[in-house]
Amino acid sequence: MNNNTKVVMNWSSGKDAALACHLLTGQGMGKVTHLLTTLSEEHDRVFMHGVREKLLDTQAERMRLPLLKVKLPASPDDTIYKEAMLRTLTGLKKEGVSMAAYGDIFLEDLKVYREQQLAQVGMAGIFPLWKKDTRDLVRLVEGSGIEAIIVCVNEKYLGKEFLGKKINSEFLDSVPGNVDPCGENGEFHTFVYNAPFFSSPIPIVTGEIVHKTYKSPDGDNKWDTGFYFLDIFCPERA
């Protein structure tokens, strides 16, 4: 692996993907040539983040990178997801992309799943944030010039008053002790509106707050919960 190794960045629109992209490039782990995102085909929004497709397009434009979109039905089963991703990864492999980067931090099962999926098409994974202290990562986000706001919270962990908060040292001081500072367990999700690798900041306007409840697919209620989403817009793409 060198500076010219072609890498696809799995892009969620949030801070972890942005920081992983920043570190990957800065540390010479490879060259990001594509962004890859999964979207709800019903709503044209990023899964769980709730970010509009137009905002994703704006991020990609600011990064001057092509954005590959995998659109999936609501609550896709594993087979549908795997088939869609394998088609996309196979196409990237044919274009000379040999690595896929992720913003995962400590979820072992997810990392193994991704690596097994990549191995099927002869690709490998890069995890620039892996096993790093999440409080340190929040400080690194702020220190590196990445600017992000919270756009989704799991109501089991955070109240809707956290929506719109910036990810910075002030947030770090206010986050409850049972919440991972990076939201690695799905406690919250973010949107990046500025980064060192953006050509310019993305102006955003906040809209309504929406509450949605999701049921555990197997009906055992083990993760039934509600989420608050902050709708955001870019005036440039209204």
Positions of PLM-derived features:
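Nucleotide-activated chemistry modules centered on ATP-dependent adenylation/adenylyltransferase
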Residues: 1-238
